């Protein structure tokens, strides 16, 4: 019954949005409703529709950084990288101390082939942000290393991330690629043995060790 009620509410919200778009006078909604609509259209595989909702939301909530971040991700999913870069720069001016924004910019630049420029952003972030954010910064650096096919650097970058947090699942999932191409098998065995000593139930660490 609860699921049915939630589904009915969602359907009503979608119908209201469709009607308001057709009438060219979207209603003013609470932020949560916009997020629900965006998620719904994404799940349906309609990123253009999600983008339309984000644009309407930004007219009402022009200082909500979450909508800017969502718009950047949607534009990236549509391979509209120049537009994504423009929006991420707007977001940076609104919230320069949100680490997610420069990381998104670094990702866009990397996909466009400007890896060196992306690495400069990473170097700046390492000087500014605290250890709590360093894991995400290192994961993005590893993404850039992989794009540059510098798999040895990618290995050491992910190793650093795992030194900070041995249970970082993203780093554990990505590091095998760097091991395979850099041939850092001995160091990989040593690293994953240390991780397993700390957490004997780390499935990913056991998996990587088994392939080393």
Locate predicted features.
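Start-of-helix register in tetratricopeptide repeats
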Residues: 32, 66, 100, 134-136, ...
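Canonical positions in the second alpha-helix
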Residues: 57, 90-91, 124-127, 160-161, ...
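Short coil turns that delineate tetratricopeptide repeat
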Residues: 62, 96, 130-132, 166, ...
């Amino acid at each position: 019954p609860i699921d049915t009620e939630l589904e009915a509410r969602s359907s009503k919200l979608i119908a209201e949005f469709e009607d308001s778009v057709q009438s060219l006078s979207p209603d003013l909604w609470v932020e949560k409703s916009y997020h629900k609509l965006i998620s719904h259209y994404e799940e349906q595989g309609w990123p253009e529709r999600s983008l339309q909702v984000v644009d309407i939301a930004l007219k009402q909530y022009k200082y909500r950084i979450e909508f800017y971040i969502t718009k950047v991700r949607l534009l990236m999913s549509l391979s509209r990288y120049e537009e994504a870069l423009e929006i991420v720069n707007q977001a940076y001016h609104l919230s320069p101390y949100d680490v997610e924004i420069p990381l998104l910019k670094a990702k866009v630049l990397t996909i466009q082939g400007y890896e060196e420029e992306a690495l400069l952003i990473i170097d700046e972030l390492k000087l500014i942000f605290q250890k709590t954010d360093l894991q995400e910064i290192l994961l993005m650096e590893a993404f850039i290393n992989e794009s540059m096919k510098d798999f040895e650097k990618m290995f050491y970058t992910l190793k650093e991330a795992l030194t900070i947090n041995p249970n970082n699942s993203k780093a554990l999932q990505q590091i095998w690629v760097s091991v395979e191409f850099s041939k850092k098998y001995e160091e990989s065995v040593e690293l994953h043995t240390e991780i397993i000593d700390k957490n004997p139930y780390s499935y990913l660490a056991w998996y990587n060790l088994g392939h080393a």
